[in-house]
Amino acid sequence: MRYMRNFLFLVLLVSLLSACSKQPASQITAEKPTVMFNAFAILRQDADRYLQSNPVLSISAQEVYDKAIVAADSKYYLVDIRSDEHYAKHHIPGSIHISYADAWRNNKTDFLPKDKKIIIIDYSGHSSSQVAAFWSLLGLEAVPMKHGMAGWSKDKEVVGGSPMPCEARNFPVVKEETAGKTYDLPRLENKTTRAAELLRQRGEAIAAKPVVIQADELMAKVNAKNVFLLDIRAVEHFKAGHISGALNIPLRGLAEESNLTKLPPDQPIVVVDYDGHAASQAARLLNLLGYDSVALRDGMSVWTGDMNVIGANAVSCAIPERSTAQLNAPANPGPSTAAT
């Protein structure tokens, strides 16, 4: 009887093992879940590292002319990001062309030299400032030319857009500070932790976003109390006068986590600085981090003519004329999205 029980037990065991072996593999081994990472933390560290390095925020058209054109200094590498049409009509001699909408693409940026100072040229300096921030995060030494082609020439045909404004709007400023709030940080779920790949993905996602807001449009939003204002100037200049309702976070500390919690992730943010260049870089960094931001075109220098409030010179259209080259056809056809 005992042997019979053992025999029956062995038969049952073999039957069970045989049944298990016939189960589909998917029932035996569960699929591994896709691991997602918070890209925000990775990109924030890169943005903070960049701002803490005290980057050069712009280079004057005069320096570009003196060094790159007159002295033919080979360390300067000029990239024009305006439209194909405007580049073809007039551009600074020696500059190559990459359209603004293509500035995030590997096949446009991988060949750029890492041992030269890349000067980025657009219409007014704002789009080039955004691209400069992006390319700097990729490891390039990139600097926008101040005021773009509008700082090179007063001729609208040469610029391809509006020339420099000749005077400030003289809109009101206040000294009272607005109490801030605390917000959750954005989350950017992604499968990769590679910073360069994350930058490319975010660059593509925000390529078509507006770059600037005009002072008149911003004034209307301020009057309607329908805007979140971020002033990134130095504390002393902010205290001397700022746009009503603005929150002050100086540029260098903008990407610190404690400061980013002061910004709403679900509300448009207008970034204000001295002349629009630093604000444009800040706006690009914030957009990469998942915020929705634009820069005030020409910054406080067009909002008010009071240099004590601005912390810098007011806008001026008094610039010398400089040479340009012409082409019969675009050197590098690109998409229609234009720089500003």
Task: Pin down the residues of each PLM region.
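Residue-level signal for short, function-critical loop segments
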Residues: 82, 124, 233, 275, ...
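Short, surface-exposed ligand- or partner-binding patches at beta-edge/loop junctions that are enriched
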Residues: 121-122, 272
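Short hydrophobic beta-strand that contains or immediately precedes a catalytic carboxylate
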Residues: 64, 77-82, 95-98, 218, ...
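Bacterial N-terminal signal peptides that target proteins for export
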Residues: 1-8
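Short, compositionally biased "basic patch" segments
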Residues: 28-37, 72-87, 226-238
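Rhodanese-like catalytic fold shared by cysteine-dependent sulfurtransferases
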Residues: 20-59, 70, 88-117, 126-212, ...
